[in-house]
């Protein structure tokens, strides 16, 4: 469990975060940065896909490693990426998305943009840039 949690903390989270920022939020599009972080995310997705070929979850049973990794993978489209060609990662992603706690956790009210006159994307952009 710790190995896969550290994989998320040291790889998936930081790289996915950078891919999201440069692809979606940065005021200036920097092709080198977008390409670099998208390629690294793709590599990390492939590692996860290979692991999930023989395991239902990252560490065998559902664990904090899955809980910490899933939200980052859920942002793949925000980074201009797809997981469709990775069948094991896609299966894992969809399986976790159906969990009751995930469904409840994703039900975020629109209070984030209340009173700002800005969209959620603009509020997030102001926060991350």
Q: Could you describe each region identified by the protein language model?
A:
Residues 5, 106-109:
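A general structural motif at alpha-helix termini
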Residues 13-18, 107, 117-118:
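Short aromatic-enriched loop/helix-cap "lid" or pocket-rim segments at secondary-structure transitions
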